[in-house]
């Protein structure tokens, strides 16, 4: 059930009405039923894999919770207090070891399902290439949203193991947390501790929050249908024929793809957060105007925030303080240099984190290379940080000016566009060849003469509509960057508020890419 389908709109309308009509204590159960219906539309087989993840996560967290409760109760008892210090320590270690076994088995089961379904053919392809083997590929369909809900449940299992959250005893609530349908398509990857207070709560109809939610949904549809799906045809044409469209076309394609991806992804997130807001559920923001970033590190603090914090909290930080890596760093300080040894754990953790980030995005080498290149530029920026700081101190007036900010923002934007070429062409060699032609075969005249751009599946009117849409999106981002929520600003002026969103609704209905004969496009992050 696509977010852009008429069926989904009808599904939401029925859900919203029922949600506030039924007794409030049953609201979360209605959401669970809605999740099952939504997911079943994508295939019942996927429900089986999700159910397995739910059962494993629920059982593991409750077993760990029971073990911890038993440990604490015993140590508080007279028998526990009578133990010697060494005996108490040995008992705690034994209990911790038992919990660790449960924890590891749960991670292996949850991540094993994801790995088997998503990466088996990738492994087979590479084994065949390396050893000239002829292993047949498996015909497995990747369940909808498996990368998102797996990471969500894994974070829950880890947080229980780390004693950050209490285990949820009701398996149906764990099922709702895992399957909450607005988050399934493209996140945000939410934490149990952040979501539980509003996900399972009883909600009264709040006119302001419902209005804000519906406005957010409408804004998401504007981005998706008016901008992203309109630009899709040109991006597909440019990336689909890299031997013909070289030089300036590659540059144009990368910029168009950046606009399409941003409108597509943030549009989907707007719909997600809007749906949750109508239901009274708070979901964290996943984007904070990333194209305003002045460096790559800032960009990744603003883009797909939930993914970045997941990898930072559960991969980067634990790995950087892992005993074996600290030991390796200590050895490097003695044998190579003190500076290198101090940085080694950060370097290794960054590279591993971004390797896994790339692999999470897709089972293909272009995504792996994309991830490693992000790591390279992040570490390169870190190495040049002292030089940058000296330059800023020496030219304080220059770097504080608007022009220098624009320069840094454009530099970061173009760097990210260059890296996304790997996503556009889906082949490492083709991507680098295409990018190389930007420097060896760049010809603006070829791209802008004789109506060349009109041969890419878009008319002049399409380009104009998309351009106006991008300008509106940029203007809204500027207001958000300076004043925060646009909806809060407009809410103080009701007439203007309703006028703006009436015009937005008309724009979606008039200029949106939908309707009879329209091949509805999946959100780009569906594939992940």
Regions found by a protein language model. Give the residues of each.
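Membrane-embedded transmembrane alpha-helical bundles that form the catalytic cores
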Residues: 1-527
